[in-house]
């Protein structure tokens, strides 16, 4: 039976009890408004661990002053009903005051990995992410933590944090879950108008175009980016907010493609900014 926990003390007490019993703990951090991408991660955690904890916490530290913190969808009852069907053991749902009872005196700073892509567009965003993930890791103390590859930059940063701080957590990246037409599942898709939703399938189609160019031998980043942009400008009303090709997971911008690379795309529609990506290269598996 799924139980909702709202305090840090109770969550830590539960974790300690299960650790004493030698149980493995899987953890899926979320901000709620759960979709199939989240549920896929939870299913994997349930199948691989004795105990699964998810968090539902809309973290104010990762929202900028002009972003959608107050408008971010909150649907706790629906989310809890969904995870109960998956036999998730605990939902950790703290308040903002519970997580941040006073102003932080210690701040984590992310280097180069937060200065490109989403980090360049959203200053301070990834500092907020690593702060809350670090706190959640300390509270839940998972053996395995599951993150979606749709937020590939976030995944790279969390993996780097775990490595740099010797955290005893195995980070598992889960493949992007998509709608039938290819649109990546996202809590922000609900902001799309009906016409924008029809157009949004072209984000993934543009990335497939890039993959086809790569497989045909194209290695010039500018050529691939140019063709992606031309395709999108022809097929969507949204604005291309960011488009680039980077090494992965080091996120160094590439002019000539070699090794494993990450093509990142962000498109801003009227009320939604959608991101998508594709990873290709020497060890790429579709």
Swiss-Prot record:
Detail which positions bind beta-alanine: 62
Specify which residues bind (R)-pantoate according to the UniProt entry for this protein. 62, 154
Write down the chemical reaction(s) this protein catalyses.
(R)-pantoate + beta-alanine + ATP = (R)-pantothenate + AMP + diphosphate + H(+)
Q: What is its EC number?
A: 6.3.2.1
Instruction: Tell me which residues bind ATP.
Output: 31-38, 148-151, 177, 185-188
Q: Which GO terms describe its biological process?
A: pantothenate biosynthetic process
Per UniProt, the keywords (alphabetical) are: ATP-binding, Cytoplasm, Ligase, Nucleotide-binding, Pantothenate biosynthesis
Q: Which GO terms describe its cellular component?
A: cytosol
Q: Name one GO molecular function term.
A: pantoate-beta-alanine ligase activity
User: Could you confirm whether the keyword Transmembrane appears in this record?
Assistant: no
Is Cell division included in the keywords of this UniProt record?
no
Note the superkingdom of the native organism. Answer: Bacteria
Active site residues according to the UniProt entry: 38
The listed locations are: Cytoplasm
User: So, what pathway does this thing act in?
Assistant: Cofactor biosynthesis; (R)-pantothenate biosynthesis; (R)-pantothenate from (R)-pantoate and beta-alanine: step 1/1
Summary of subunit composition and partner proteins: Homodimer.
Record's miscellaneous remark: The reaction proceeds by a bi uni uni bi ping pong mechanism.
NCBIfam families the record matches:
panC (TIGR00018)
Family membership noted in the UniProt record: Belongs to the pantothenate synthetase family.
Main function = Catalyzes the condensation of pantoate with beta-alanine in an ATP-dependent reaction via a pantoyl-adenylate intermediate.
Name of the protein in question: Pantothenate synthetase
Instruction: Supply the gene name.
Output: panC
